[in-house]
């Protein structure tokens, strides 16, 4: 069999180089320097070492005194101030304001807001009765337990009850 014959006879796909029938030489020149040396030369080193405005604003040390101090800034600073809350050690990170101070269930009153008085506890709204069983039940007793749709009647595990949840009587 001649080496030029294709035994599968599938059409060959054309691309930019072989569409006209002749192969073009590659216009891309090989790099002169390796990558680690080229990164130390211009313009790559200048572009890499000069921060953009966006990347400067993302920096933890960035502070702009011209930012207006409006209501939104006040609310954001009340939740988290990244100028004072960064670069803390592990023991300071684990401390939380809610756990170190008695601020549980307190709400910050912003300018122009009026806080509503807290609602009284449920015990004042309803007469709650507490009952204690005089006879201690056994923890192994199934009387009064929560009914399950499965039963432990089989040896290898649990199976479904006959009527899907309760035994028929």
From Swiss-Prot:
Span list, region Disordered: 26-45, 150-169
Ranges of Polar residues composition bias in the record: 36-45
Basic and acidic residues composition-biased segments: 160-169
GO BP annotations, alphabetical order: flagellated sperm motility
Keywords, comma-separated and alphabetical: Cell projection, Charcot-Marie-Tooth disease, Cilium, Cytoplasm, Cytoskeleton, Disease variant, Flagellum, Neurodegeneration, Neuropathy
Subcellular location: Cytoplasm; Cytoplasm, Cytoskeleton, Flagellum axoneme; Cytoplasm, Cytoskeleton; Cytoplasm, Cytoskeleton, Cilium axoneme
GO cellular-component term (any): sperm flagellum
Quaternary context: Microtubule inner protein component of sperm flagellar doublet microtubules.
Name this polypeptide is given: Cilia- and flagella-associated protein 276
Summary of the tissues where the protein is detected: Expressed in cerebrum, cerebellum, gastrocnemius muscle, spinal cord and lung tissues.
Record's disease association: CFAP276 mutations may be the cause of Charcot-Marie-Tooth disease, a disorder of the peripheral nervous system, characterized by progressive weakness and atrophy, initially of the peroneal muscles and later of the distal muscles of the arms. Charcot-Marie-Tooth disease is classified in two main groups on the basis of electrophysiologic properties and histopathology: primary peripheral demyelinating neuropathies (designated CMT1 when they are dominantly inherited) and primary peripheral axonal neuropathies (CMT2).
A Pfam family recorded for this sequence: DUF3695
Protein role: Microtubule inner protein (MIP) part of the dynein-decorated doublet microtubules (DMTs) in cilia axoneme, which is required for motile cilia beating. May play an important role for the maintenance of myelin-axon integrity. May affect intracellular Ca(2+) homeostasis.
Primary location: cytoplasm
InterPro entries in the cross-refs: CFAP276
Organism: Homo sapiens
């Amino acid at each position: 069999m001649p080496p030029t014959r294709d035994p599968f006879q599938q059409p060959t796909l054309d691309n930019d180089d072989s569409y006209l029938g002749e192969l073009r030489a590659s216009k891309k020149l090989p790099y002169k320097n390796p990558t680690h040396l080229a990164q130390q030369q211009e313009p790559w080193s200048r572009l890499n070492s000069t921060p953009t405005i966006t990347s400067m604003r993302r920096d933890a040390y960035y502070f702009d005194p011209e930012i207006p101090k409006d209501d939104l800034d006040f609310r954001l600073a009340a939740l988290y101030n990244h100028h004072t809350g960064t670069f803390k050690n592990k023991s300071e990170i684990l401390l939380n304001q809610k756990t170190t101070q008695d601020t549980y269930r307190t709400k910050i009153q912003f300018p122009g807001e009026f806080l509503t008085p807290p609602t009284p506890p449920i015990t004042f709204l309803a007469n709650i009765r507490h009952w204690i069983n005089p006879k201690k039940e056994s923890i192994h007793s199934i009387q009064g337990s929560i009914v399950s749709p499965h039963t432990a009647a089989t040896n290898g595990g649990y199976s479904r009850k006959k009527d899907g949840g309760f035994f028929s009587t």
